[in-house]
Amino acid sequence: MLGMIKNSLFGSVETWPWQVLSKGDKEEVAYEERACEGGKFATVEVTDKPVDEALREAMPKVAKYAGGTNDKGIGMGMTVPISFAVFPNEDGSLQKKLKVWFRIPNQFQSDPPAPSDKSVKIEEREGITVYSMQFGGYAKEADYVAQATRLRAALEGTATYRGDIYFCTGYDPPMKPYGRRNEIWLLKT
């Protein structure tokens, strides 16, 4: 636990590598098309709980893993954004299922420490191309749903993306009160 606190206060923060392919602006929605690198990710999946409740369960597990709760006792530092996959119903509401993805820092990509918590899994993920839109505040499930609706409306007729999944991302620690950065990522098809 001390490693996690030390790491969150003094540790490094690495940005998940991506390249901006294009930018757009429609109906007061600014967005980017990005190619995001793949790699190894620590993941936690939670089902049968609303998104906000599932996040309160999953995020500390990922943070503890990054902070040193692993077989090597190494605090790795964080990568941003932390993302989580959500699965919309036909009406736009979200299913009671999510999967948190934490990209393991580059220094540990070739040989990541094994998680001590069995609910944390290490997975290899291919690169993805996304349509991304940024927004601020302390985001909750309703905010992600509303922002995803705005991004879909802005992309209507100009882009194709998956409708069965999208990513919600955050860049800031929970204790940051102002200037928070969140994003919605729709997966390009």
Curated annotation (Swiss-Prot):
Gene3D superfamilies with a match to the protein in the record: Regulatory factor, effector binding domain
GO biological process entries: circadian rhythm
Top-level taxonomic group: Eukaryota
Chief localization: cytoplasm
InterPro entries documented for this protein: Reg_factor_effector_dom_sf, SOUL_haem-bd
GO cellular component, one term: extracellular exosome
One GO MF term attached to the UniProt entry: heme binding
Keyword terms of this UniProt record: Cytoplasm
Compartmental location: Cytoplasm
Subunit and partners: Monomer.
Comment text on domains: Forms a distorted beta-barrel structure, with two helices that are packed against the outer surface of the barrel. Porphyrins are expected to bind to a hydrophobic patch on the outer surface of the beta-barrel structure.
Chain's role: May bind free porphyrinogens that may be present in the cell and thus facilitate removal of these potentially toxic compound. Binds with a high affinity to one molecule of heme or porphyrins. It binds metalloporphyrins, free porphyrins and N-methylprotoporphyrin with similar affinities.
Family from the record: Belongs to the HEBP family.
Protein name in the entry: Heme-binding protein 1
Species per Swiss-Prot/TrEMBL record: Homo sapiens
